[in-house]
Amino acid sequence: MARKVIDVRIVNAATAEQESFIKELSMELIHDVFPLYFSELDIQRFKKKGVLSLNNHYYQGTLKEAFQIMACLQMIHIILTKPSPHSDLSDQAIFEKNSKMLNDFGIYFPFAFSDFQKKTNKAFFGQRRLI
């Protein structure tokens, strides 16, 4: 008689406060950071397309995921609000890593580091269309 092996894993769920904080960090990026780089019209388009919204298909709601998402959002915020964020290649690598992680967790973040250039943002002047 064959024995069945059942793989059971116990994970901790993210708290309501953590999920609320993720939404707060997302709104902070949209309302405080994006205006430094994009027009109000572009930001409205981002909202309609679901930028920084959570896709529950990928997000499992675990404590680990919540902490990683919060850390990614905070790192992107820090990099984009630095006095000269485009002068350091390590900033670009950190930005790209955190951007990829957000997308892997189901948070729609279609931006590249080069999309965040003050006053000369080329993303919406024909060179690269994000959405």
From Swiss-Prot:
User: InterPro entries, per this entry?
Assistant: Uncharacterised_YhcU
- Protein name as annotated: Uncharacterized protein YhcU
Classification from the root reads: Bacteria, Bacillati, Bacillota, Bacilli, Bacillales
Q: Which gene encodes it?
A: yhcU
